[in-house]
Amino acid sequence: MGCFGSAGSKQSDSNSSEDTKSQKRRSDAITRQLQKDKQVYRATHRLLLLGAGESGKSTIVKQMRILHVNGFSDSERKQKIEDIKKNIRDAILTITGAMSTLTPPIQLEKPENQARVDYIQDYASGPDFNYPPEFYEHTEELWKDRGVQQTYERSNEYQLIDCAKYFLDRVSEIKQPNYTPTEQDILRCRVLTSGIFETRFQVDKVNFHMFDVGGQRDERRKWIQCFNDVTAIIFVTACSSYNMVLREDPTQNRLRESLDLFKSIWNNRWLRTISVILFLNKQDLLAEKIKAGKSKLSDYFGEFNRYQTPADAVCEMGEDPEVIRAKYFIRDEFLRISTASGDGKHYCYPHFTCAVDTENIKRVFNDCRDIIQRMHLRQYELL
């Protein structure tokens, strides 16, 4: 009996030893995987896009997809058609609706177009509108009307999406049954961002995770969820918004709101060690407004009257001197905030951008990569 017991004991010891070895192999494999995951996590640059609503953050994300992922597939382009049609509908509804509410109100150039306005206001505003051919006909004819054009020119007096003119100019293409949106159409298309969206891409074998968060006031409470382990903040401001007010608060100037928001982020105690890359966006629209001369920057920012173009200003060939002065004034308004309360732990790096211009964003992002790399090394105390 003792011999049998002894053999069973040896077998049991052998099984136990194998189990222990197997558990150790599994444990070692888990440890190696965790170590690998940690290395990948630490090697990833996490970029947080912040800024007020309609500043161009989501357009920056689209550019990263075009430049560093695979752009947009045919099915994704087709899916955007409904959003683009909605942009056209929102634009013509808003403009024709504003004609009678402006002070002084604006009349149609052709009184016979009133029936077209009535159609747009009565039928196109419905929730189940299906964009019949007459909608496009009415929209095209109204967009040619001088009264509608004058109302568009006063769009800073009401809320109108930036892409209104772009898509209203292209109704004849978009209404075609075989229409497929171009990259520029997708970049221009406006869709409200609600929540947090992550885009992952790789540049020269370096991993980037970019987080886009809604910029409207009621969306900003979600920002705190993204602050952990951020490599850098990209703050986006719409420079062309100097003569506009917020959708959510018609008493607040949009550019001043952006400056206030930048100040709150810059002075946030949780972000004191995170540097900010400042995208002074919508330079194309800013230049249009300044050159048109109808909305003077000094009417909204009295300090501009005394402002002189700084010595470090870089001028592009043929650039209007007043446009140069305006864009550097806005830059310096932000830098005044960062230099007033900077403690040497984080820095502000300004760049002039046009988010719908792929070459511009490619050049700017390449310029930023060295900055982001330094921030990443400092984040893990390697610099």
UniProtKB/Swiss-Prot annotation:
Residues 1-31 are annotated as: Disordered. Mg(2+) binds at residues 58, 193. A lipid is attached at residue 3 (S-palmitoyl cysteine). One of its GO terms (biological process) is sensory perception of smell. Keywords: GTP-binding, Lipoprotein, Magnesium, Metal-binding, Nucleotide-binding, Olfaction, Palmitate, Sensory transduction, Transducer. The keyword DNA repair does not apply. Residues 277-284 are annotated as: G4 motif. GTP binds at residues 51-58, 187-193, 212-216, 281-284, 355. Residues 185-193 are annotated as: G2 motif. Residues 18-31 have a biased composition (Basic and acidic residues). One of its GO terms (cellular component) is heterotrimeric G-protein complex. Residues 353-358 are annotated as: G5 motif. InterPro entries: Gprotein_alpha_S, Gprotein_alpha_su, GproteinA_insert, P-loop_NTPase. GO terms for molecular function: G protein-coupled receptor binding; G-protein beta/gamma-subunit complex binding; GTP binding; GTPase activity; metal ion binding. Residues 8-17 have a biased composition (Polar residues). It comes from the Eukaryota. A lipid is attached at residue 2 (N-palmitoyl glycine). Guanine nucleotide-binding proteins (G proteins) are involved as modulators or transducers in various transmembrane signaling systems. The G(s) protein is involved in hormonal regulation of adenylate cyclase: it activates the cyclase. Participates in olfactory signal transduction. Belongs to the G-alpha family. G(s) subfamily. This is Guanine nucleotide-binding protein G(s) subunit alpha. It comes from Anopheles gambiae (African malaria mosquito).
